[in-house]
Amino acid sequence: QYVLEVGPGTGVLTKYLLEKPTETYVAEIDTESIEYLKLHYQKLENKHFTGDFLKINLNDIFSGEVAIIGNFPYNISSQILFKIIENYQQIPEMVGMFQKEVAERTAAVPRTKDYGILSVLVQAYYDVKYLFTVHENVFNPPPKVKSGVIKLTRNRKEGLEGNEILFKQIVKTGFGQRRKKLSNALKSLDIPEVLKSHAFMDKRAEELSVEDFINFTQEWKAAKN
């Protein structure tokens, strides 16, 4: 029903979104860009927000689900993805352009150098598809890095109910020392005695799938109860 474009600038993408049957809103931190959009796109009347997307409360604005789209600022790429995770119940999908390295990390699979905290946490809530790479020479002035466009489609994994805080803690701690086996990497978390001989303890965080982390979290929680 709703689409929110983050960081529309002068509306290069906005004009195409406004041709669609969905209701398009924009969030832009730059006041001059908002004034430009208001002047050139009448359909955006009362559908624009001046401010930081990271601080916007989506529930205050949208009565239903809202898809997110944007050419996102590279300096807050990870924060935008974490904001989407936090609001997964209201955000069924996202299509966005990020710095290529961030896009690749988000879509990465186990046993690869790009697989890490971002990969696991995003993929616990969304299916991730790397769509295409955007080269520097299509921008003016060209940036120093390539860009990548990814799509997130909500598909929250089973087993997270009531375990989300512990799940995130295990993932972040495990990857905090990614070259160490989990038996060492997770020492600071007071590992339950029954799990100290668990098969996963002999592996590194990068070897575990998203489902492995969720199952391990469930076993950890059960051992503590």
Regions from the language model: what does each represent?
Residues 1-169, 173, 215:
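Catalytic cores of RNA-modifying enzymes
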